[in-house]
UniProtKB/Swiss-Prot annotation:
This is Cytochrome b. Belongs to the cytochrome b family. It is a multi-pass membrane protein. GO terms for cellular component: mitochondrial inner membrane; respiratory chain complex III. Binds 2 heme b groups non-covalently. PANTHER family: CYTOCHROME B. It comes from the Eukaryota. Keywords: Electron transport, Heme, Iron, Membrane, Metal-binding, Mitochondrion, Mitochondrion inner membrane, Respiratory chain, Transmembrane, Transmembrane helix, Transport, Ubiquinone. The cytochrome bc1 complex contains 11 subunits: 3 respiratory subunits (MT-CYB, CYC1 and UQCRFS1), 2 core proteins (UQCRC1 and UQCRC2) and 6 low-molecular weight proteins (UQCRH/QCR6, UQCRB/QCR7, UQCRQ/QCR8, UQCR10/QCR9, UQCR11/QCR10 and a cleavage product of UQCRFS1). This cytochrome bc1 complex then forms a dimer. Its cofactor is heme b.
């Protein structure tokens, strides 16, 4: 008799995706982050659903409803901090996942990579709108500053901003629509993640060597389910340490003050996971130029498959490109630090150098390194 998981229409889909899936035998712990991102999404949707039961998207009561969740709702403080820190965890896993994709040349799978970039944009939009909902000082001013950037778009900019705001400033209409979008987008992200997986399973996983692994495959279960389980245990240990011992470590103290349109905070800045892009935005004195650079800082990932010059896919045996990759990682960390600093010397010039370096490494230095390494193969 045939096993039920191989015949039942629904179980057959799960079986092909997570049980009998042929996987390369040599993929390392860096391949864990896909499943960890799935876990983060489940945590966010679940905790967000319970928060939405008590939250009111109204300028007069939003802040007090969040306070009510933390003080009066049973384990409300835990749900709220799990949701807030879950976003940080999501982005940590997301950036590591992208970093692994760049290092091992996973961007060669064009469809999977492009869906991944779309997922990154959707996640950033969701996180931004979620940050506005508690209606604290940094929520309000962050929303005002970031949405105002759209006014830099020629001709339609001002109309577009007022259309998004639902008025002439960030107000009740803005909060309401941001809540609606913040609620629906995670489900769209979940659907897109399914498409991401669908495209990945068309080609099969990449591996650290960057060479075809058709001759040496092993079933996903039990080998990689147990490996993923170890990643989940470690991630949860880190997550609950953050939530239970340092819940406000990654937040902004300004968000514990209710939103006040008449009082601007001295340093308006987004959450830590957007600081690198925010630093790139601020490093260009022109508003439109800054907005273009901001979008390109993420969209540049879509160019990677087209500017790949090396004959080897992975960076595992390419020392020059390895050096440039870690220089890029250091540069992104430097930009993250700069994004949280005030706009004054020496931070301005450091930010400008780091921003230039970010684009130069990806667009100029890495393709040149690939050509040099091709020549080295002949020596």
């Amino acid at each position: 008799m045939t096993i039920m998981r191989k015949t039942h229409p629904l179980m057959k889909m799960v079986n092909h995706a997570f049980i009998d899936l042929p996987a390369p035998s040599n993929i390392s712990g860096w391949w864990n982050f896909g499943s960890l991102l799935g876990l983060c999404l489940v945590i966010q949707i679940t905790s967000g659903l319970f928060l939405a039961m008590h939250y009111t998207p109204d300028t007069l009561t939003a802040f007090s409803s969040v306070t009510h969740i933390c003080r009066d709702v049973n384990y409300g403080w835990l749900i709220r901090y799990m949701h807030a820190n879950g976003a940080s965890l999501f982005f940590i896993c997301l950036y590591l996942h992208i970093g692994r994709g760049i290092y091992y040349g996973s961007y060669s799978y064009m469809e999977t990579w492009n869906i991944g970039i779309l997922l990154l944009f959707l996640t950033m939009a969701t996180a931004f709108m979620g940050y506005v909902l508690p209606w604290g000082q940094m929520s309000f001013w962050g929303a005002t500053v970031i949405t105002n950037l759209l006014s830099a778009i020629p001709y339609i900019g001002t109309d577009l901003v007022e259309w998004i705001w639902g008025g002439f400033s960030v107000d009740k209409a803005t909060l309401n629509r941001f809540f609606a979008f913040h609620f629906i987008l995670p489900f769209i992200i979940a659907a897109m993640a399914m498409v991401h997986l669908l495209f990945l399973h068309e080609t099969g996983s990449n591996n650290p060597l960057g060479i075809p692994s058709d001759c040496d495959k092993i079933p996903f279960h039990p080998y990689y389910t147990t490996k993923d389980l170890l990643g989940i245990i470690l991630l949860m240990a880190f997550f609950f340490t953050l939530v239970l011992f340092f819940p406000d470590l990654l937040g902004d103290p300004d968000n514990y003050s209710p939103a006040n349109p008449l009082n601007t905070p001295p340093h308006i800045k987004p959450e830590w996971y957007f600081l690198f892009a925010y630093a790139i935005l601020r490093s260009i004195p022109n508003k439109l130029g800054g907005v273009i650079a901001l979008v390109l800082s993420i969209l540049i990932l879509a160019l990677l498959p087209h500017i790949q010059t090396a004959k080897q896919r992975s960076l595992m045996f390419r020392p020059i490109s390895q050096f440039l990759f870690w220089l890029l990682v250091s540069d992104v960390l430097a930009l993250t630090w700069i994004g949280g600093q005030p706009v004054e010397p020496p931070f301005i010039i450091i930010g400008q150098i780091a921003s230039f370096l970010y684009f130069a490494i990806i667009l100029i230095l890495m393709p040149i390194a690939g050509i040099i390494e091709n020549k080295m193969l002949k020596w």
